[in-house]
Amino acid sequence: MAKTLYEKLFDAHVVFEAPNETPLLYIDRHLVHEVTSPQAFDGLRAHHRPVRQPGKTFATMDHNVSTQTKDINASGEMARIQMQELIKNCNEFGVELYDLNHPYQGIVHVMGPEQGVTLPGMTIVCGDSHTATHGAFGALAFGIGTSEVEHVLATQTLKQGRAKTMKIEVTGNAAPGITAKDIVLAIIGKTGSAGGTGHVVEFCGDAIRALSMEGRMTLCNMAIEMGAKAGLVAPDETTFNYVKGRLHAPKGRDFDEAVEYWKTLKTDDGATFDTVVALRAEEIAPQVTWGTNPGQVISVTDIIPDPASFSDPVERASAEKALAYMGLQPGVPLTDVAIDKVFIGSCTNSRIEDLRAAAEVAKGRKVAPGVQALVVPGSGPVKAQAEAEGLDKIFIEAGFEWRLPGCSMCLAMNNDRLNPGERCASTSNRNFEGRQGRGGRTHLVSPAMAAAAAVTGHFADIRSIK
């Protein structure tokens, strides 16, 4: 029987399945950070249980960390407690931790892939909704809650029901300057922010194959923003070349044997999906969100939509509420909308390819007066690579702030946040009300588009910036 990639991954990890029972899955990798793990470790301690597979569990600090200093006290009392608890828990339970002073420290979904913790064919979980990122490698990766974190720590398994399947095919070739961020925002604009609910999405098509691993990670990272459980891209030579030689990747003959297995991780001819969505890459322009969910998105050349243009009453009401919160008027060109802050970073867009794209725009230019622009590399290795290439100097000379690794302004859990009413061009993944700070207004864009907004002071079409 022909199977989809998701079905192959799921079936390969079923430990036990009984009629009318939720299947029990084996978990290959468990990623841990400071925010969703303290209660889980407390649960182990209360029941005198060890971590079942400490060698398959990897921890880092990211959500709460300061991006201006490595001082654990810098982000406030709650952040300090959570980070100190993580240090204590990892020491006690034998879990490898990339703490503030470790060269590999960074955002959990950047650290995992770059250290070879993430490999094709695996099941990967983390107490974080954007765990879908790792699906770029052909791994079944999804976020879990704190009680599930405890269950995986204790048993290396998790009860998980089968999801529906969705194929999103992006055909043709994207125009120069169009990135994975533009592609995935265009997809969410088509499906809506709940269009993938109950599904695991497989991204395919020529435009997807043409993406680097960084681009595929951006794509899968935002699968959750269309309501999907997880996102997948079947592994290929691009995947194998990225993984080869990384710290935790197989070596020598083991790697060659692994690749032979990984090559089987693709949807069979004749396999059927519950839902199919198609887009043409050449029709995708640079994207900017205008509302308060990622599905409220338009091309940079478009005007702010009129709520009256939405036939669905729920969408119309949502648009009215979003425009009121965002302080926008229908009919205004996006390129007339001024910004206060720019954030280049997050688990969506903080990898070396993202920073190169932003630096290309920033080079020889200056951040517009009155704009604060932050560049936050996703990990220690990304920061070191960027500095080796001189990207930090380009940013600093242009007036951007070059920061230490962390989740930063993606979410208001550290010192990097918006003030009420401030408008931000952000490369992160969520533009919900208050996501970047109470009353803050978030517009999601690609790194190049964020840099363009920084140097012009408003949204600008990257294709028109020479």
Curated annotation (Swiss-Prot):
Keyword tRNA-binding among UniProt keywords: no
Keywords, alphabetical: 4Fe-4S, Amino-acid biosynthesis, Branched-chain amino acid biosynthesis, Iron, Iron-sulfur, Leucine biosynthesis, Lyase, Metal-binding
Cofactors (names): [4Fe-4S] cluster
The keyword 4Fe-4S is assigned to this record: yes
UniProt-listed Pfam families: Aconitase
Annotated positions binding [4Fe-4S] cluster: 347, 407, 410
Reaction(s) this enzyme catalyzes, per UniProt: (2R,3S)-3-isopropylmalate = (2S)-2-isopropylmalate
Record GO terms (molecular function): 3-isopropylmalate dehydratase activity; 4 iron, 4 sulfur cluster binding; metal ion binding
InterPro entries per record: 3-IsopropMal_deHydase_lsu, Acnase/IPM_dHydase_lsu_aba_1/3, Acoase/IPM_deHydtase_lsu_aba, Aconitase_4Fe-4S_BS, Aconitase_4Fe-4S_dom, IPM_dehydratase_rel_enz, IPMI_cat
SUPFAM superfamilies noted in UniProt: Aconitase iron-sulfur domain
Complexes and interactors: Heterodimer of LeuC and LeuD.
HAMAP family: LeuC_type1 (MF_01026)
Protein's name in the database: 3-isopropylmalate dehydratase large subunit 1
Organism for this UniProt entry: Salmonella typhimurium (strain LT2 / SGSC1412 / ATCC 700720)
